[in-house]
Amino acid sequence: MARKMKSMDGNNAAAHVSYAYSEVAAIYPITPSSPMADLVDQWAAAGRKNIFGTKVRVQEMQAESGAAGAVHGSLNAGALTTTYTASQGLLLMIPNMYKMAGELLPAVFHVTARALASHTLSIFGDQSDVMACRQTGFAMLAEGNVQEVMDLSPVAHLAAIKGRVPFLNFFDGFRTSHEIQKIAVWDYDDLAEMVDMDAVNAFRQRGLNPQHPQMRGSHENGDIFFQNREASNKYYDAVPDLVEEYMGKINAKIGTNYQLFNYYGAPDADR
């Protein structure tokens, strides 16, 4: 389907995509990510539907730590859930990020990368916040401009759903989050066509339900803990191919050339 052209910033682009693939958004505002949460809240209040035909349930928490806990709980209940944050707010989410990754929950965090406070606070952009999350087990996907945010944000959601590995999708705070560009916008019908509904249904079936109770969050001794941690490696090994697969589907729809690695140079180069 031909895409419409609209003028918007990076926050709007990420919010547009995340609304399509989310059933719950647990939010707490922090500059420069706040417009994403605000837009999603406005759209839900106006009755806008996601690709599943429902409104996104938006819940503002008392802090970013609470938002992360709500994301974790919502995912465990079988609802596709996202949040939006940056800087110190992202650091408050790290404890829950370890849990989400360890439990193979398809969380997607949209982050406007921003400097961490040191001797003083700074609202301007670097990537010290997202780099502090590399060890959590979240896959990380980055975009460099507003059109890329629109085009590639679906990859984070689609790969998380099918691959069961949570994603941190980020772009530069202010430089991209607040830059207004005229871009091609996804139609929700196109976004719906790319989602693996079998994976969505399997995720929902794994949700906590009193009709088929299960035990989570138990204690394990080192020998069993080690084996269960190793068992998750196959999901991480599959992530690059999944990302490439969904980039290919996006390329087929919109004529782009997104790949994990793009070569630029002489076609006959030998060194």
At which residue positions do the language-model features occur?
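Thiamine diphosphate
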Residues: 1-132, 137, 154, 173-174
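Hydrophobic alpha-helical scaffolding
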Residues: 4, 8, 26, 61, ...
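Generic recognition of stable, solvent-exposed alpha-helical segments in well-folded globular domains
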Residues: 35, 148-151, 241, 245
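Conformationally flexible catalytic loops at phosphate/diphosphate-handling active centers
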Residues: 52, 56, 167-263
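Conserved thiamine diphosphate
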Residues: 123-173, 185, 197
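RNase H-like, metal-dependent nuclease domains and their acidic two-metal-ion catalytic environment used
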Residues: 268
